[in-house]
């Protein structure tokens, strides 16, 4: 469950390390984002020679949350940390590698690229 001011780690090699949610996209008064939702983020910490610089604003898709996601069979998949993958204006990933597992809920037309790059799909 991600809301405004939430900090997330970045699960791709775009150059950003930590980002902060500045808006949950998808509705005028939408408060929370879960796995698979697109948010607007600001880069708070970045590595020296990466594509993303501190202060840059990007779209991002949430790939892991502490809250987790409930499956139809009743099981819940939770993670230790909140994480997102940075996206460009066309909602394509900026990085070329994805770190850590992602969930099956990302297997939509939009985010198949992220699923194919991920080392593990839960």
UniProtKB/Swiss-Prot annotation:
<dbReference type="Pfam" id="PF00238">
    <property type="entry name" value="Ribosomal_L14"/>
</dbReference>
<keyword id="KW-0694">RNA-binding</keyword>
<dbReference type="GO" id="GO:0022625">
    <property type="term" value="C:cytosolic large ribosomal subunit"/>
</dbReference>
<dbReference type="GO" id="GO:0006412">
    <property type="term" value="P:translation"/>
</dbReference>
<comment type="function">
    <text>Binds to 23S rRNA. Forms part of two intersubunit bridges in the 70S ribosome.</text>
</comment>
<dbReference type="InterPro" id="IPR036853">
    <property type="entry name" value="Ribosomal_uL14_sf"/>
</dbReference>
<dbReference type="InterPro" id="IPR000218">
    <property type="entry name" value="Ribosomal_uL14"/>
</dbReference>
<dbReference type="GO" id="GO:0003735">
    <property type="term" value="F:structural constituent of ribosome"/>
</dbReference>
<comment type="subunit">
    <text>Part of the 50S ribosomal subunit. Forms a cluster with proteins L3 and L19. In the 70S ribosome, L14 and L19 interact and together make contacts with the 16S rRNA in bridges B5 and B8.</text>
</comment>
<keyword id="KW-0689">Ribosomal protein</keyword>
<dbReference type="GO" id="GO:0070180">
    <property type="term" value="F:large ribosomal subunit rRNA binding"/>
</dbReference>
<dbReference type="InterPro" id="IPR005745">
    <property type="entry name" value="Ribosomal_uL14_bac-type"/>
</dbReference>
<keyword id="KW-0687">Ribonucleoprotein</keyword>
<keyword id="KW-0699">rRNA-binding</keyword>
<dbReference type="InterPro" id="IPR019972">
    <property type="entry name" value="Ribosomal_uL14_CS"/>
</dbReference>
<comment type="similarity">
    <text>Belongs to the universal ribosomal protein uL14 family.</text>
</comment>
<protein>
    <recommendedName>
        <fullName>Large ribosomal subunit protein uL14</fullName>
    </recommendedName>
</protein>
